[in-house]
Amino acid sequence: MTKEQAPRASGEKEEGCPPEYIVFDEERGEYICTLTGEVVEETVIDTGPEWRAYTPEERTRRSRVGSPLTHTLPDYGILTTISGYRDANGRKLEARLRIEASRLRRLQAKLRATTSIEKNIEQAAREITRLVEALNLPRGIIDTAMMIYRQAAEKGLVRGRSLESMAAAAVYAACRIRGIPRSIDDIAEVVKGGRKEVARCYRLIVRELKLRMPIVDPVRYVSRIVSALRLSPAVERRAAEILVQARKMGLTAGKDPAGLAAAAIYIAALELGERRTQKEIAAAAGVTEVTVRNRYKELVQKLNIPLPAQ
């Protein structure tokens, strides 16, 4: 291992390791940055079950320490929560004890988030969960988005800014990191702040947290847009061919992948006689008509695509 490749010692911890480079080493119980070799977090308890389980009862009995750690809670979910309905043996509580347990649960919720940052993170967790469910995204996006939001909160980036917009920006960043094909317009549709504010917060997060965003292949957007427009598999295949050709010629770098996918679908639909308007395609892709029109002109000209008379 060369000097440049050697992992940093734990005492030389570098702040702000990009989330997409953080992996969990199950054997050592550590979160490690694959970019620098830095141990981001150590002595993490392995929270999964020890053996295979085939029934809910077996899973409960064989799990060592309960639920896994989560970024959606200020305390990472380490603390237990008072049950409001059953005792330690699983028996239902009588009415008087249920009322008392409910009061204790409310008190515990207040005590759990003690600082303003923790309270903000708790509110953000609810908003991020709402966004992920509204957009029908994989549940894993919640943890990635919360990791990003938590870093932003700890750096003071959320102060004075809309919690909704910052949460939406974190969700968009998480989608980019995990390769989920969603445009910023898709996400802005389910928040009050609007696209411009979400985009501003996203740029702030990427810049200040020094996130390295992977380039999203526009081909990944094609299937979802084609399905929304009820176009044929032939259109999907042809649009993908156009995008592969565009990538080889260097036409996709720095362009919105959703806009490129929309333009390629528009061209493919024209070629195969399954016409859709630019307005329809833009709406399905979550981009503007202007974006579709500009990318369409560019692809047709640079790739020398002959089109039937419109």
UniProtKB/Swiss-Prot annotation:
<dbReference type="Pfam" id="PF00382">
    <property type="entry name" value="TFIIB"/>
</dbReference>
<dbReference type="InterPro" id="IPR000812">
    <property type="entry name" value="TFIIB"/>
</dbReference>
<comment type="similarity">
    <text>Belongs to the TFIIB family.</text>
</comment>
<feature type="repeat" description="2">
    <location>
        <begin position="220"/>
        <end position="301"/>
    </location>
</feature>
<dbReference type="GO" id="GO:0017025">
    <property type="term" value="F:TBP-class protein binding"/>
</dbReference>
<dbReference type="InterPro" id="IPR013150">
    <property type="entry name" value="TFIIB_cyclin"/>
</dbReference>
<dbReference type="InterPro" id="IPR023484">
    <property type="entry name" value="TFIIB_arc"/>
</dbReference>
<keyword id="KW-0804">Transcription</keyword>
<dbReference type="InterPro" id="IPR013137">
    <property type="entry name" value="Znf_TFIIB"/>
</dbReference>
<comment type="function">
    <text>Stabilizes TBP binding to an archaeal box-A promoter. Also responsible for recruiting RNA polymerase II to the pre-initiation complex (DNA-TBP-TFIIB).</text>
</comment>
<dbReference type="GO" id="GO:0003700">
    <property type="term" value="F:DNA-binding transcription factor activity"/>
</dbReference>
<dbReference type="GO" id="GO:0097550">
    <property type="term" value="C:transcription preinitiation complex"/>
</dbReference>
<dbReference type="GO" id="GO:0070897">
    <property type="term" value="P:transcription preinitiation complex assembly"/>
</dbReference>
<dbReference type="InterPro" id="IPR023486">
    <property type="entry name" value="TFIIB_CS"/>
</dbReference>
<feature type="repeat" description="1">
    <location>
        <begin position="126"/>
        <end position="209"/>
    </location>
</feature>
<protein>
    <recommendedName>
        <fullName>Transcription initiation factor IIB</fullName>
    </recommendedName>
</protein>
<keyword id="KW-0677">Repeat</keyword>
<dbReference type="InterPro" id="IPR036915">
    <property type="entry name" value="Cyclin-like_sf"/>
</dbReference>
<dbReference type="Pfam" id="PF08271">
    <property type="entry name" value="Zn_Ribbon_TF"/>
</dbReference>
<dbReference type="InterPro" id="IPR013763">
    <property type="entry name" value="Cyclin-like_dom"/>
</dbReference>
<keyword id="KW-0805">Transcription regulation</keyword>
